[in-house]
Amino acid sequence: MKNMLQILFSVSLLLSVSLCSNAAVILQYHHVSDSTPASTSISPKQFEVHLQYLKDNNFKVVPLSDLIEGIKNQQPLPDKSVAITFDDAYTDVLTQAKPILDKFAFPYTIYVNPGIINRNINNDASHYLSWIQLKALSDEGVIIANHGYEHNSMVRITDGLTQTQWLIKQTESLLKAEAIIKENTGQSWRYYAYPYGEYNVAVQEWAKKNDFVAFSQQSGAIDLSTDLTSVPRFPASKPYDKISGLRDKLNSLAFNISLKDGQAKTIFKHKEAKNITFNIESDDFYKSALNCYISDLGKQKIIWHDDKSFSINFSKDLPVGRVRANCTAASISKPGRYYWYSKPWFILNSDGSWYHL
């Protein structure tokens, strides 16, 4: 009887771990075209390669709302599930991406800027989808979500405003955008993709207070522990469009890593940030297998304090611009899959001015 109870307990524990460790991935695209800027584009041919890979390898492509509602309700996510998203609502999403998506019957989400759409409403040469086109897509089940009224950064404060005044102004702008989306498509998910992926702690608190789920641009998988004020997405356009690199990302697992108090800060002047300390909850990896890389700095030395905490002293000053630390480790229980966590920084010039986009 004792052995039977031990077996039942072990099976129950394994099942619990399996359900909780299920991971999903959100892919981020912009243009699907051969003639648009390479840094935000994937060719139609390569986009179809991506979708074929998803189908051939039994990934579950689901509406973004399935994943977010699962996290909100703490319902286990289908393992190897994927959501497809497009930022900026370019016309080639309709003319180039949609026929391919329809071929595979894959759902997707488009993040839109209502102010930009409205300015181009009578422009036949516009590169942006119209409300008529977006309504038709909405009627077919495409999720239409918020990318801000204009494509303005949430953290680049202008007009001499304080942080509080700026957030009040941005709240009005974002709610205006949400209302316009609802008026034209009937949808209001309160899903918001940060323009340029830029955010800070104050913006995260603002998103939570205003009941917005906010999506960023740092990489990583998601699970039930994901912070809904900075949901990661994997960029899948050039130069990250090769299947060889996408394969590991699609199979990645969410790394349950958090930041020490005061280290969630994302914005520093050049040469200001020197180190960072992480808390980690997972036991499903060997410490020796953990690797962390930082943009332009390469692989970093990891300093373990105990089994649940480690630090990185940056090998050089973080470069000006958008910077990422990517930490990965092979899973013990799921061979061939990697835990993946990304921490973003937005490094200003030494005088405190913003870098150029």
Regions inferred by a protein language model and the residue ranges of each:
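Metal-dependent polysaccharide deacetylase catalytic core of the NodB/CE4 family, i.e.
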Residues: 27-39, 57, 72, 78-82, ...
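Positively charged n-region of N-terminal signal peptides that target proteins for export
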Residues: 1-7
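Bacterial N-terminal signal peptides
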Residues: 7-18
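Beta-strand-enriched, solvent-exposed domains that form extended recognition/catalytic surfaces
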Residues: 257-357
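N-terminal pre-catalytic segment of deacetylase/amide-hydrolase enzymes
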Residues: 21-82, 251-264, 312, 334-357
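Catalytic-core region of carbohydrate-active enzymes that cleave or remodel glycosidic bonds
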Residues: 176, 181-185, 206-219
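Short, compositionally biased P/S/T/A/G/V-rich stretches that sit at domain boundaries
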Residues: 236-272
